[in-house]
């Protein structure tokens, strides 16, 4: 890989490779005429007329310090590859999009569409999803494709459907639910010509009954999101290696002509993982496993694969077939806004859905009880209460159930935590859920995946993570090495120590906090914030963001992530907080508050969820 900058009308090229690939890169540079070498800066110098040759030899393996259009400005350079590269940044293929992609995303989309079979390995937060959607849009526009199969993690299916609608304005069918419901979704997609995207998870492909239905649909494009799920795709009888179920299932989709993969963590220094990924993309890139093994793998019959070699050669074999950018690249930093807000919608587990439905049912029963209260006294739980006392008693129970709803979205295990109330323990007991049933937290899994990618891509980055609950903060703290914990339960001295360690220690990457850290702290050493759950007010949300979005932050771009469980209390809270935030802006700029007063966001979110549940049950009753 090379870095290119322009100065004083010349082009300066620096080789960024490790020793394994340096010689291959140097050999390519020596093919280009008119070069000189600057010993002081360690760069090769070319005239601008050599830009086309650089693109020819390095293509998507160039880091531009300035946008290409600026480099060739006021320069009479006419080269087919340059013109093609510049045309990739046009909006022609995205005229109907609600949200226009960034220039580097357009380049990524065109790269995928032009290659037809390729990989995108962009770093965290650069938008691999819109780039894949963009590649599909380009192929639609060229009449080369009509139907797309997206394969992703179970928790991200509805997130994909939302992203497709957000960018391209198209509906997508996400396959979820019971076996009968999943079959209905797939068959429904097959019978409709107005919907072009079907979104499934890897486990769905592993089912013979679903795969049979999917293979009957004439898909033109298949895209694997989080493609590291197929990194174990080797079949080797001599070494006694079997492919993973995910890889085996995905390889059955290689009849689909356009194939894309996306992941921020493509390989972990294992040559066999490279082969597994690119065997799906195009098996002609690296050939058969047996030939690949002899060329790149150290192995023995007793210990299996023990290492790799010839990695420089391997890199240049796959280089034309993938594109990778990170936020640390100057060209990317120039295109991104100072602050990005990204909502990550996750799929609820079966246990979470059952708990949420059970809690909503209890709330409805309590509300019915409150509505039936007369003006007289009642004996409740052995206590004599008047109507007002009874109402306050039931309001307290509802507030507790609201808390359980939020905790369920975060991690169901919070309901049976040693410090949890007997009422929350009873909820789990009433449903007959086992510790295994409630052990999984899609939010926590998403966070750990994000952290893994971040440490791989951006070792200098730091993250602030907020949650409303101390118990949740401790669970996150225990799951993340290199982290510090800031809560209202620690002393002032400990708080000062935690802040100093996060600011000063380069190895301390994650600051995990409850509401105690939402005001007054300067944490501008971080460039990412994760809202594990949402606060009750838009003001507090802005206060959280203000910990890193402040003067003095040395990072060019910072990103705020909001983790939201789809079709849950979370989602309703997000909608209401957004409306409240917009309202606050209107008031501050002279608008008038015409909305009703009284209920807080928490109560409104619960009311919305109850109404949605009642409506859903009404449909089921009449269906």
Regions found by a protein language model. Give the residues of each.
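A short beta-strand element within the Helicase C-terminal
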Residues: 276, 522-534, 558-562
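Hydrophobic anchor at the beta1->P-loop junction of P-loop NTPases
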Residues: 120, 465
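Conserved helicase ATPase motor motifs in RecA-like P-loop NTPase domains
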Residues: 124, 257-270
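SF2 helicase/translocase NTPase motor core
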Residues: 77-111, 117, 126-247, 255, ...
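Inter-lobe coupling linker of SF2 helicases/translocases
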Residues: 199-204, 209-218, 242-256, 262, ...
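A short helix-turn-beta junction within AAA+ P-loop NTPase domains corresponding to the substrate/partner-engaging
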Residues: 275-287
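Accessory DNA-engaging acidic/polar modules
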Residues: 1-98
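Conserved SF2 helicase motif VI
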Residues: 538-558
